[in-house]
């Protein structure tokens, strides 16, 4: 870990703030009337996803850290433990959901044998990187009311991982759909 001056911190840098890894979302540099400088930072905690603001003086320093991505294959879920295999070393990485509650929202997006990236800091997984849109198979659909098309009519559908989303009335069991992983919303139907 390296120490960097506040004037050298840039957007996208990774810093250790109050013992937790953060990414710099915004950086604003301003000079004061007496020749001093102030750097205002907007930071996102990579563990709990909280956003904070910090102000550093020109002479202040911060601890830069290295975050790395491990390319992994999702193997299975055993009760509250997700098991991945590192594609470089073939080591298995277990992720206990009881200890990492912030991964709960990503569990329903994980599909066995698919490739993902684990964001790691100090040999600890701090995030699971998902693709912006993920393909799923529809396993169950809610009955739709015929003729209910005055507005953008939607119905609940259940996907192969158990995720339930709203989709247009024309979606049927067996269809493949793309889902936006950030908003958890239907994006489009995949044509065969």
From Swiss-Prot:
The keyword Nucleotide-binding does not apply. Its main location: cytoplasm. Pathway: Protein biosynthesis; polypeptide chain elongation. GO terms for cellular component: cytoplasm. GO terms for molecular function: translation elongation factor activity. It is found in: Cytoplasm. The keyword Nucleotide-binding does not apply. SMART domains: EFP (SM01185), Elong-fact-P_C (SM00841). The gene is efp. One of its GO terms (biological process) is peptide biosynthetic process. This is Elongation factor P. It comes from Borreliella afzelii (strain PKo) (Borrelia afzelii). NCBIfam families: efp, PRK00529.1. Keywords: Cytoplasm, Elongation factor, Protein biosynthesis.
């Amino acid at each position: 870990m390296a120490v960097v001056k506040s004037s050298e911190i840039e957007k996208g840098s990774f810093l250790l703030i109050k013992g937790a890894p953060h990414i710099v979302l915004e950086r604003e540099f301003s000079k004061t009337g007496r020749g001093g400088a102030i750097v205002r930072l907007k930071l996102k905690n990579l563990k709990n996803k909280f956003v904070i603001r910090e102000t550093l003086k020109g002479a202040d320093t911060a601890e830069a850290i290295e975050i790395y991505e491990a390319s992994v294959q999702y193997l299975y879920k055993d009760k509250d433990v997700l098991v991945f295999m590192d594609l470089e070393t073939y080591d298995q990485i277990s992720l206990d959901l009881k200890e990492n509650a912030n991964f709960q929202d990503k569990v329903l997006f994980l599909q066995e044998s698919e490739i993902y990236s684990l964001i790691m800091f100090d040999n600890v997984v701090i995030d699971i990187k998902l693709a912006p849109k993920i393909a799923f198979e529809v396993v169950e659909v809610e009955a739709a009311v015929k003729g209910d098309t005055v507005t953008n009519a939607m119905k609940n559908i259940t996907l192969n991982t158990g995720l339930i989303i709203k989709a247009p009335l024309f979606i049927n069991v067996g269809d493949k759909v793309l889902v936006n992983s950030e908003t958890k919303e239907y994006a489009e139907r995949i044509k065969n």
